[in-house]
Amino acid sequence: MNKLGIYVHIPFCRKKCNYCDFISFPCKEHLIDNYFSALEKEIDSFNIENKEIFTIYIGGGTPSFCDSKYIVRLMSLLKYKFSIKEDAEITIEVNPGTVSEEKLLDYKKAGINRLSIGLQSTNNRLLKLIGRIHTYEAFLETFEYAKKVGFENINVDLMLALPTQTKEELIESLNNVINLKPNHISLYSLILEENTELEKQVKNRNTRTSKWRLRKKNVPFI
């Protein structure tokens, strides 16, 4: 039986981050119900035979911005329609400030076994600069909730080369997250995408870019 992975895009969020160029619609709660109804119809239209699902990734946007009932419904349909491996990795992206202990518990009961938490930095000044809705302290609360409800597989996203970010601030963020001992850390370099709020700010010289750049090889300060 051939293996297959599934990605489900949930294009809603509370606020679009300044660097984001993904398809996302901030504060459009009135569209969520119709979107999930259309999504469920599309999933139901697929007829996939002799394929075993080994991974499911629910991304966005901010999937955790939506009421957990939609994610529970989605997971129920995926299980009904497809042959999902017993040990399949099933991930949902969550952002601090959009989840509660109850919502995370709903995810776990629905069969989600991995969280990808968008942190980006442990420096509150930088978080505000790039338009994140949360603080480092809110992330710590979310991380604690995740552990409390029993999530054992947690990824934490961090970003480097943020505007005005220093090497020392990056190292501090890395050390802070490493000390929490998540299963995985994803470290992404900022890309100034065209027509994003951050790209406009830099172009208009309202925001300074980092004074440092990573080399392709031998990054001595990490």
How would you name each of these model-derived features?
Residues 2-34, 197:
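Canonical Radical SAM [4Fe-4S] cluster-binding loop centered on the CxxxCxxC motif
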Residues 24-222:
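Conserved non-cysteine loop/helix-boundary elements of the Radical SAM core domain that shape
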